[in-house]
């Protein structure tokens, strides 16, 4: 559909939304200054906070959120598509959403996406996470047409659920977006391979803006923001823990070409799953007949 420059912004968001908004604006301006027509920020751009009491004072409804207001203004001023990877939003029902926003070059809100899969895990290093205790999961995938490309939306832990990305690719997505705040431990093990796999298996670009470094609340995120092409080649990569901007050219014709070379979207078949037991020979004989 088009050729354009895309930017992924790496941040180290702290507990104070106001300070994060200042860094957010500076980095967005840098990205636009480098020619990016689409700019993506990481998950939890607004604030990274573990303490429940601090969250209660920091999280705001959409209409009074600082990052949302800044993004609306900046997208119009700079004439860019600005994708806030996510920020915590207090919903009308009192629940909290981990919500992404896409603003158009005229400042209009083009799309929202709420993170679907909650990160509820216990890691080997003692870290324990229960996102479902704080956030209300979304229930709808999203593909947004921005003229230059069709974007498929995801946030962080969604990356581990390939069916989401396949559904978006089948719906026309040529660029898969994965703003994230991966832990250092899981990022070292899985970040690069998962992002490249999602690109390869769907014949799509992947843009993944990340949080990186040691945060005020004690957590450490992996960084390494990436832009990957449909063949799995890394086009741009950020450092582990330094805030900054990476930029790469996106040519959606490369997505069409990758899908022509490896037409797995077209070749996919529905199938059933048989279940047998090696300890029940009769069942095995039945499956073979």
Q: What is each residue range found by the language model?
A:
Residues 3-15, 40, 99, 112-114, ...:
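Active-site-proximal beta-strand elements of phosphoester/diester hydrolases
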Residues 17-18, 25-106, 112-114, 183-198:
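Cys-nucleophile CN-hydrolase/nitrilase-fold catalytic domain and related Cys-dependent amidase chemistry
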Residues 19-28, 160-166:
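Short, acidic/polar
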Residues 42, 116-119, 179, 210:
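Conserved residues at the C-terminal ends of beta-strands
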Residues 62-83, 150, 156-245:
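CN hydrolase (nitrilase-like) catalytic-core segments centered on the catalytic cysteine
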Residues 84, 99-102, 142-144, 225-227, ...:
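Short beta-strand scaffold segments in enzyme catalytic cores
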Residues 91-171, 184-193, 261-264:
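Active-site catalytic loop in hydrolytic enzyme cores
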Residues 112, 210-289:
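C-terminal beta-strand edge segments of enzyme domains
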